[in-house]
Amino acid sequence: MSLQVPGDHLLHDAHLAYTVGRLLGMQDNIIVPKLEGYMGSWRRSEIVGTTQNGNILMSDYGHHPNEIRPTLRAIHEKYSDKKIFVVFQPHQYSRTRELLQEFAISFSDADSLLIPDIYFSRDKKEDVEWMTMERLISEIKKHQPNVIDGK
């Protein structure tokens, strides 16, 4: 099976969908073309433009380490001849605090990372005070030295 979307994680999902289809009695000539024609979800590795010199601009809403890692890995594999510059805005101080170590290791497939700020939403004062940009940048730099504080 050959997919339009990159990533072993999506190929794995397609194999699972194929298996479910077969268990439900569907034939290959129905299942396979649909899976091979799948172009991806809105705001997940979505190509939104190309610059004049050929840089590809993508948008991805993944904001959890379990989404970021496989997405960047897939982009790195598909565009191995290109540099990957990521702009990432963590969503919620509390989530960033809770998943700090996971976020720290999530950007190894990026060449550079810019973090503008942490998006405030329903956060408690103690989370905002504890989860500073300096702390986030410091943890990420242990695994991705090319991280920039964008605020």
Where are these regions (language model features)?
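C-terminal helical cap/extension that packs against the catalytic core
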Residues: 56, 104-151
